Amino acid sequence: VSQNLMRGMSDTLFQPDGTLTRGQLMTILYRMAGTPETEAATPFTDVASGRYFTDAVAWAYEAGIAEGVSGTTFAPNAPVTREQLVTFLYRYAKYQEEDVSAQGTLAGYPDAEAVSEYAQIPMAWAVEQELVNGIDGKLAPKGAATRAQIATIILRYYAIYGE
């Protein structure tokens, strides 16, 4: 919060156990990148101009960090899953030209088979870097990420790669 990457849900409420949305995550990554200027438009009909996430989604799409749930839908208000979170963060790290070659194994997790194909390399990277440790011994890739989880992951990311 002090870095202005995340804001509370109100002036007095952070809501750490609240579900993180796709729009909120793009906004966090956009702020981590320093809110770069973008002239890009998105193909997403559900990303209206003037919303808090509009520039962030446009930037993330242009930078190759984010894709929609379809060619024309981003679903900014939908919960972001844990596998989507690590995939977007993995792509952000690549965008920042960080070394993302370290990949661990998911074999120790009983739900490793549940990780979508697109998220397997990012999840293996996140596990190897100890950005994610699992929940009760599971990856829970389809589970909704919380605001507390992304705050923790950002702290771990900065500990590894710096600001």
Language-model regions, residue ranges each:
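Catalytic cores of secreted/periplasmic or lumenal enzymes
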Residues: M123
